[in-house]
């Protein structure tokens, strides 16, 4: 696929603004903050699928494609790629829109990864997923 024709995959699960407090020593947005936003967004979708509590058990293939700047609008898109007996595997993409730095208005993918969540009961023990239709 031509990168100019690329669009986010999945549904928007989180949208926020990159702030100065989220920068690293170089002035770019800290990768750990981006990963945290991805985990929050992915957990929202996983909770909908599990119909309850979930915990993150792994992050695979975290790829940072481009840096994120202060003032960028950060959006996390997620879609379920697999479910197991208790686990939910979700592909998450971070897309940013430049609103306060050049090139203004540009919208592109900056980060992607696969997160695995496990449904848990009130005691934190794995819980079997109920049948569902993927959201």
Swiss-Prot record:
Keywords: Hydrolase. It comes from the Bacteria. It is an enzyme of class 3 (hydrolase). Residues 8-123 form the HotDog ACOT-type domain. GO terms for cellular component: cytosol. Its EC number is 3.1.2.-. Coiled coil: none annotated. Belongs to the acyl coenzyme A hydrolase family. NCBIfam families: PRK10694.1 (NF007970). This is Uncharacterized acyl-CoA thioester hydrolase bbp_254. It comes from Buchnera aphidicola subsp. Baizongia pistaciae (strain Bp).
